[in-house]
């Protein structure tokens, strides 16, 4: 064995490549070993250093792959054992054990997290060269007994199913020990680069290779200063020193110092020396030179998005200077926090990248499909699961519009559960759903699912066969091919499909002869797919590489950007969270010398120093270290390592927000510039100098010219939210000349509430989602129908009998039977409505002097100027003197307010008065008023009553009164009835004013509607809060940002409120 160390200013790879070349020139076969995470990059680096740029004598690979070179022909043809297969084997083992067999883990038998921990423990045991019987000294002896039962049973299943229990390294080591590879290894040289520690499995293999290979060469970075130190605790080279010292002691050799021809920039060497001096308690009498600072940058940004954008701009600048994407490396402090954001931002700046991390399959449509299939079976055809399965695009041949129509109907008819899905759809509504088409679609969905879900407990092999038959019926494979929209997606889908078929194969192999329920089968496949990962190799090498910062090696790329280096992530603190604690691992390691667990937490300090050292020397030309103030929506501090750099004299640059400028980094990329122009177009203008304004004026002129060529435009508006007028063609179709504009009191209220709401409801005719379950609209219909029947009954029957008959016959109507007898909730609603009817009906019995002239009276009121107002009057009453009045039933409290009417928000009663005046063209003296009747079951607070007497009954009847507009002329006749006339009496002239102003409201609204321009203007009564319908989901209206667009209501003091509003009405309606 030969151990080599060198300073950070030299290239260890070049030194080791020279050693490899010498061995290759002598006829030896050379294996150049790199860590798993670096083998691809190391291969490119080694081949670049070779003069011939390639050779068959030097193979750059990993330990595992090297073992396959030697054992590929001699290894037994057994099944491969991966993590998913291991999880299934442990699941099968746990199925065979009873809870009482496992005192410690019996309750976790079906827990997926526990099974994952078993898989990790089993892999750890293999890497540590330990068996489950070596797990002595655990906190609870019962734990070892349970683990022995589980793992031994799992290993028995592996033997039965012919799985290879040995890892590739174990098979390689066994072949070496048996002397099967002596001839090959005698002509082999092993070169190892990039390691600072070996696992127990690698350590054992290395001892065998050292005895049988021609030579083993290992290199590591250690400074000469550190190598000569006797005390190395806390030294930045502590990990490498321990690594070399352990090897030197074990193999009785002395490490040698070597140098390379390539020497990196002195600035990085000087920074390393300062960093080393800080941690080995020595001092230096110099600081970084001014020109050294050109190679380092410390950035501070507010949050992640700004940080990534600054990096993207800097990368575009490097390209402008002539460098390539492959010259750039981006390192992430927190891979999970940055992974979702960095892709879209780099795409915006048109920067191709390769994320060096396996992607989880959990977000792929195929996994979502399998999960929905499993949940559909487990939860008995729940609607959400069936729809999610369809929306994955992998079930059958359905268009998106078909799925939307199916979803709309199933929500309306409340289709959920197998019983409802299996029966033909028969319920329809005013929208007239295409039931024939929907039933055909229902059959295409239900039949294959029903055939699969009726499977009883049977052999796993039979279940897999039925699953495959089901996949064929729904055209799963063909649909999977149709998902891809690009070559990259095709490659991703191929990898996902391969993992899917591997999981099915493993399940068939492990559970083929085991009896299982379909639910267990689907759950196992789902769990395997959700935990699986896949990796796609980039189509070109000229990409920006992105990976976690703790995987970096010295001198990786000319330009390195390390972002997210906050105190929480740099340094990283790694802790085990498996079935064994670190203390238990340590006790086991004390007993076993050469077989041991890796305890990450015990090596955090020296590993973090090693990582920081590699990071500070990762670049050969320029290193940028960046930290956000806010990461994952939480504030974080500077890393202690970055604070050290600041103490060395490196300035911390506050990058600030990404304001637009005319620097190359801002305008050098068309797509990024366009996106920023759009962003600034949507926000308030920032302050600019005259020079900036001139520049951006020219740029906008140029951009608009380019956009016109592509038929695109940048909208401009004075408000954050704006609407466009309808075109003349649309106006002619929606409001044709010669045909009156149809309005109603409700439509007018909606218009004055928010014009855009009127546009949605009455121009686009958009409706809310329907439902067969009774809502306030259907409740109102029921109450109206009961009172209509009651008031039509002129027989001599007692009033209570009439009421019972009205309720009974209404309940027997087919529509109400269908609505209110569907389930217990609907029956409960009906019971409440019946109580409301019984509570409100007495008010009709008291007013025996009233004669009901008509009910549910349709009217069409001609307002002139091609405006036709239509509606339905619930009831027309006649007093004893012949005067007429209107009653409007309400299921909620309503009261006429003259201020609300003035602002257009309560025109109903006055509109009905105008209609009654047209229907019965008599003098206004014959109208006694228009009123609301609140249909309610009055609630009284008994605490306020000292005793139960007549005052209690009076309070009930007081709540059941008519409230609205009343004629002052009819005051005497109204005083004997249940009319609330206080502050509600109007003279004939005042009633005429109300009628004329009501007409003015309709004419004003109609004029605006016919122009076809509808504003987003919900009303506000105080200028501080918005009471109108904001329609946030559609308009994105925000009260704090868009208050200027809200319509301010006219409000007046309570004193003389009525007279002041009437004066305003006369003025505005020109009376």
From Swiss-Prot:
Instruction: Note whether Lipoprotein occurs among the keywords.
Output: no
E.C. numbers: 3.1.-.-
Keywords associated with the record: ATP-binding, DNA damage, DNA repair, DNA-binding, Exonuclease, Helicase, Hydrolase, Nuclease, Nucleotide-binding
Primary enzyme class: hydrolase
An annotated GO BP: double-strand break repair via homologous recombination
The protein's required cofactor(s) are namely:
Mg(2+)
Which InterPro entries does the entry link to? ADDB_N (IPR049035), DNA_helicase_suRexB (IPR014141), P-loop_NTPase (IPR027417), PDDEXK-like_dom_sf (IPR011604), PDDEXK_AddAB-type (IPR038726), Restrct_endonuc-II-like (IPR011335)
Keyword DNA damage assigned to the entry: answer is: yes
Question: What is any Pfam family matched here?
Answer: ADDB_N
Q: Name one GO molecular function term.
A: hydrolase activity, acting on acid anhydrides
Tell me the subunit arrangement: Heterodimer of AddA and RexB.
NCBIfam families annotated for this entry? Answer: rexB_recomb
- Described purpose of this protein according to its UniProt entry: The heterodimer acts as both an ATP-dependent DNA helicase and an ATP-dependent, dual-direction single-stranded exonuclease. Recognizes the chi site generating a DNA molecule suitable for the initiation of homologous recombination. This subunit has 5' -> 3' nuclease activity but not helicase activity.
* Other facts noted in the record for this chain: Despite having helicase-like domains, this subunit does not have helicase activity.
Q: Which PANTHER family match?
A: RECBCD ENZYME SUBUNIT RECC
Task: Give the family from UniProt.
Answer: Belongs to the helicase family. AddB/RexB type 2 subfamily.
Please identify the protein, giving its name as recorded: ATP-dependent helicase/deoxyribonuclease subunit B
Q: Which gene encodes it?
A: rexB
């Amino acid at each position: 064995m030969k151990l080599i160390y060198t300073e950070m200013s030299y290239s260890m790879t070049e030194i080791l490549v020279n050693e490899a070349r010498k061995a290759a020139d002598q006829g030896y076969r050379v294996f150049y070993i790199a860590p798993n995470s670096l083998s691809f990059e190391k291969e490119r680096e080694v081949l670049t250093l070779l003069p011939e740029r390639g050779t068959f004598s030097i193979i750059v690979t990993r330990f595992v792959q090297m073992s396959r070179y030697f054992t590929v022909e001699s290894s037994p043809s057994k099944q491969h054992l991966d993590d998913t297969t291991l999880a299934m084997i442990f699941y099968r083992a746990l199925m065979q054990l009873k809870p009482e067999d496992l005192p410690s883990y019996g309750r976790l038998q079906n827990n997926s997290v526990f099974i994952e921990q078993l898989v990790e423990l089993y892999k750890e045991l293999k890497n540590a060269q330990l068996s489950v019987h070596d797990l002595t000294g655990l906190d609870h002896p019962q734990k070892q007994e349970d683990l022995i039962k589980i793992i031994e049973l799992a290993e028995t299943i592996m033997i039965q199913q012919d799985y290879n229990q040995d890892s590739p390294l174990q098979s390689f080591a066994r072949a070496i020990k048996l002397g099967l590879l002596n001839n090959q290894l005698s002509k082999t040289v092993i070169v190892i680069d990039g390691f600072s520690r070996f696992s127990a499995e690698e350590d054992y293999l290395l001892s065998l290779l050292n005895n049988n290979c021609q030579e083993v060469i290992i290199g590591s970075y250690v400074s000469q200063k550190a190598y000569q130190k006797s005390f190395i605790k806390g030294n930045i080279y502590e990990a490498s020193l321990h690594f070399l010292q352990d090897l030197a002691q074990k193999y009785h050799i002395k490490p040698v110092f070597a140098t390379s021809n390539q020497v990196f920039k002195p600035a990085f060497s000087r920074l390393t020396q300062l960093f080393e001096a800080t941690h080995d308690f020595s001092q230096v009498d110099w600081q970084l030179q001014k020109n050294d600072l050109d190679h380092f940058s410390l950035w501070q940004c507010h949050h992640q998005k700004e940080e990534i954008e600054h990096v993207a701009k800097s990368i575009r600048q490097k390209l402008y200077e002539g460098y390539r994407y492959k010259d750039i490396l981006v390192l992430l402090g927190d891979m999970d926090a940055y992974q979702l954001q960095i892709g879209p931002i780099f795409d915006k700046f048109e920067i191709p990248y390769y994320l060096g991390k396996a992607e989880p399959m959990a977000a792929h449509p195929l996994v979502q499909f399998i999960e929905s299939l499993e949940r559909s079976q487990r939860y008995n055809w729940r609607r959400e699961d069936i729809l999610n399965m369809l929306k994955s695009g992998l079930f059958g041949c359905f268009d998106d519009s078909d799925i939307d129509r199916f979803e709309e109907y199933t929500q309306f008819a409340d289709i959920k559960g197998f019983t409802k899905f299996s029966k033909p759809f028969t319920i329809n509504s005013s929208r007239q759903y295409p039931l024939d088409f929907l039933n055909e679609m229902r059959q295409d969905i239900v039949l294959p699912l029903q055939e699969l879900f009726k499977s009883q407990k049977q052999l796993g092999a039979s279940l897999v066969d039925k699953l495959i038959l089901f996949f064929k019926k729904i055209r799963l494979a063909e649909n999977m091919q149709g998902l891809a929209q690009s070559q990259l997606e095709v490659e991703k889908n191929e990898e996902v499909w391969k993992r899917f078929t591997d999981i099915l194969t493993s399940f068939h192999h492990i559970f083929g002869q085991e009896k299982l329920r379909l639910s267990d089968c689907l759950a196992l496949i789902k769990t395997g797919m959700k935990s699986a990962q896949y990796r796609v190799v980039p189509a070109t090498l000229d990409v920006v590489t992105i990976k976690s910062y703790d995987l970096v090696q010295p001198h990786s790329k000319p330009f390195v950007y390390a972002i997210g280096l906050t105190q929480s992530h740099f340094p990283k603190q790694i802790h085990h969270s498996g079935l064994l604690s670190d203390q238990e691992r340590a006790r086991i390691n004390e007993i076993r010398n050469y077989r041991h667990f890796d305890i990450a937490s015990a090596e955090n300090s020296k590993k973090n120093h090693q990582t920081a050292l590699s990071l500070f020397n990762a670049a050969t030309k320029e290193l940028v270290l960046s930290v956000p103030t806010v990461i994952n929506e939480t504030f974080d501090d500077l890393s202690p390592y970055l604070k050290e750099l600041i103490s060395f004299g490196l300035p911390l640059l506050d990058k600030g927000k990404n304001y637009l400028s005319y620097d190359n980094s801002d305008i050098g990329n068309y797509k990024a510039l366009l996106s920023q122009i759009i962003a600034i177009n949507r926000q308030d203008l920032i302050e600019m100098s005259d020079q900036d304004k001139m520049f951006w004026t020219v740029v906008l002129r140029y951009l608009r010219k380019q956009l016109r060529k592509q038929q695109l435009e940048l909208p401009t508006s004075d408000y954050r939210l704006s609407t466009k007028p309808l075109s003349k063609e649309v106006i002619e179709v929606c409001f044709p000349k010669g045909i009156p504009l149809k309005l109603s009191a409700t439509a007018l209220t909606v218009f004055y509430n928010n014009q855009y709401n009127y546009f949605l409801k009455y121009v686009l005719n958009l409706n809310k989602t329907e439902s067969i379950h009774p809502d306030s609209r259907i409740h109102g219909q029921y109450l109206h129908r009961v009172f209509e029947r009651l008031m039509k009954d002129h027989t001599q029957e007692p009033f209570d009998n009439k009421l019972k008959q009205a309720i009974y016959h209404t309940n027997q109507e087919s529509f109400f039977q269908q609505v209110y007898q569907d389930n217990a909730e609907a029956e409960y609603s009906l019971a409440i409505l019946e109580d409301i009817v019984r509570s409100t009906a007495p008010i009709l019995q008291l007013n025996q002097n009233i004669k009901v002239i008509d009910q549910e009276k349709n009217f069409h009121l001609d307002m002139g100027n091609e405006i036709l107002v239509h509606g339905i009057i619930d009831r027309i009453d006649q007093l004893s003197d012949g005067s007429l009045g209107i009653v409007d039933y309400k299921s909620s409290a309503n009261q006429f307010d003259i201020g609300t009417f003035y602002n257009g928000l309560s025109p109903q009663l006055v509109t009905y008065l105008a209609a009654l005046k047209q229907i019965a063209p008599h003098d206004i003296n014959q109208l006694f008023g228009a009123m609301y009747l609140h249909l309610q079951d009055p609630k009284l607070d008994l605490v306020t009553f000292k005793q139960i007497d007549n005052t209690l009954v009076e309070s009930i009847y007081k709540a059941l009164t008519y409230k609205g507009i009343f004629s002052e002329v009819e005051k005497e006749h109204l005083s004997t009835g249940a009319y609330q006339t206080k502050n509600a009496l109007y003279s004939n002239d005042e009633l005429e004013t109300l009628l004329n102003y009501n007409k003015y409201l309709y004419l004003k609204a109609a004029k605006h509607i016919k122009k076809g321009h509808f504003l987003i203007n919900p009303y506000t009564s105080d200028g501080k809060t918005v009471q109108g319908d904001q329609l946030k989901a559609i308009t994105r209206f925000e009260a704090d940002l868009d208050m200027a667009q809200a319509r301010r209501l006219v409000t007046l003091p309570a004193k003389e409120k009525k007279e002041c509003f009437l004066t305003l009405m006369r003025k505005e309606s020109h009376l």
